[in-house]
């Protein structure tokens, strides 16, 4: 039985999914499983994922949303701990897995580890780390509820606090990559990188793009994506 389930929600983002998966393989030392909830990608964008024997790929016919994918992934996971990543995030260094477990288990009050969000929401979605049993036993959902929250897992944040527990929020810090995005720090080190709007303009399936970027914004999107995938550390992960 694996100790950690690494889960992400994917839709038509093959290059981001590959980078995340390969970073998990490279930098994870404990026993783990990888679960990818695919929200209706085109067949051409699943070719690489379908060839990976160590990935449990759940292919859905339509997009159930990020929060629903978190709930589904948690339910089918087999591990004590769950690390749910944005698909356009990846791990930057070894030790991340044991350090998150140490942080979580070091305080009985901590029931969710996330990332400090912008002013209008308490959490940012590059990473959520939690214990499966606690989430399921307390019927905590990560669904996006428009009237109650501003993004995925915001209600879960308040539900956990209202139960008398704590949510540990990791900070963003100094960057290794010179790209638009956040580098999440753990124990003072860059540990997880999250590309801003990495999947917002979906060149792999333009019909499903979430936001229409044009002009300077579109130019910056592709420039930063190119810079990231040409960075020596990313090239090393993708080998």
Language-model segments: which ranges?
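N-proximal low-complexity "stem/linker" segments adjacent to membrane-targeting elements
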Residues: 1-22
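Glycine-rich, basic loop-to-helix element that forms the pyrophosphate-binding segment
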Residues: 60-76
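Short, acidic, metal-binding catalytic loop of nucleotide-sugar glycosyltransferases
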Residues: 23-31
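Conserved donor nucleotide-binding strand/loop of the catalytic core
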Residues: 50-64
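Short aromatic/hydrophobic "clamp" motif used to bind/position activated sugar donors
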Residues: 82
């Amino acid at each position: 039985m694996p100790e950690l389930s690494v889960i992400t929600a994917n839709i038509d983002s093959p290059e981001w999914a590959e980078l995340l998966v390969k970073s998990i393989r490279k930098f994870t030392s404990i026993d783990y499983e990888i679960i990818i909830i695919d929200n209706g990608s085109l067949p051409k964008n699943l070719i690489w994922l379908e060839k990976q024997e160590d990935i449990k790929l759940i292919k859905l016919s339509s997009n159930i949303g990020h929060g629903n994918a978190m709930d589904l992934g948690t339910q089918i996971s087999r591990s004590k701990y769950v690390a749910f990543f944005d698909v356009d995030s990846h791990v930057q260094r070894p030790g991340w897995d044991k350090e998150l477990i140490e942080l979580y288990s070091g305080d009985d009050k901590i029931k969710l580890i996330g990332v400090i969000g912008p002013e209008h929401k308490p959490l940012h979605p590059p990473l959520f780390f939690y214990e499966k049993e606690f989430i399921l036993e307390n019927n905590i959902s990560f669904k996006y509820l428009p009237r109650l929250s501003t993004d995925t897992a915001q209600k879960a944040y308040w539900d956990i606090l209202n139960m008398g527990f704590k949510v540990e929020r990791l900070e963003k810090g100094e960057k290794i990559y010179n790209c638009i995005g956040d580098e999440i720090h753990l124990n003072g080190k860059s540990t997880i990188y999250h590309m801003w709007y990495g999947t917002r303009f979906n060149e792999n399936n333009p019909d499903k793009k979430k936001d229409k970027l044009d002009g300077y914004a579109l130019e910056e999107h592709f420039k930063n994506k190119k810079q990231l995938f040409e960075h020596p550390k990313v090239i090393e992960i993708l080998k």
